[in-house]
Amino acid sequence: IKEIRPTLMCSVPRFWEKVYAGVQEKINETTGLKKALMLDAIRVGRIHNLDYLRLGKTPPVMNQLKYKFYEKTIYSLLKKTIGIENGNFFPTAGAAVPDEINEFVHSVGINMVVGYGLTESTATVSCTLPVGYDIGSVGVVLPGIEVKIGEDNEILLRGKTITKGYYKKAEATAAAIEPDGWFHTGDAGYFKNGQLFLTERIKDLFKTSTVSYTHLRAHET
């Protein structure tokens, strides 16, 4: 990343978890004024970006001034250390993003966009918008895709970007796709404020933040 210094970078949540862990470790090792400034930078950023801009409101003048100061110092240094100072768009998907990670990333001025999608949906089904998104959601459904919540709160998809079936696997296709075109994702979720939230995998597998698959029974024994 430091060699490329991308303007756009797709990632899984685990990447941001490592960034967050590294920052927390640095804060814990630091003392005095430096530590106080680092903590205040995160607090100011949370107010500026989450409490105000996220809700379409203008931050207080004093908060704006503090944010601009930290933007040129602490936020800038953090981004340069990671190698993303040129970045302006960071799609993230593949697993759930913990709320504390989501809040931290936005607090330091990183434009992380959380999305949801599958191979069978030709990738993105929904994603968060710059304004009005709820922490913990995977955003609003993209145009051209239908989403409904079925039995057991399963997320069902339909649309031109959704697969018509699995190659030479008639039984798997019949099991996954209803006659009227609704595709069973195996993911459970719900809608709130027009945004999609994921809750769990209905099937016997779940995704970890590294996007590997783990069998639930292995954890129960």
Regions found by a protein language model. Name each.
Residues 2, 7-10, 21-133:
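Gly/Ser/Thr-rich phosphate-binding loop
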Residues 7, 210-211:
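Alpha-helix capping and helix-loop boundary segments enriched in small/acidic/polar residues
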Residues 14, 95-96, 161:
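Alpha-helix/helix-capping structural signal
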Residues 14, 118, 220:
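Residue-level "edge-of-site" marker
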Residues 17-19:
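Switch/connector loops and helix/strand junctions flanking conserved nucleotide-binding motifs
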Residues 141-208:
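Conserved ATP-binding/catalytic segment of the ANL
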Residues 214-221:
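Conserved small/polar residues in nucleotide/adenosyl-binding loops
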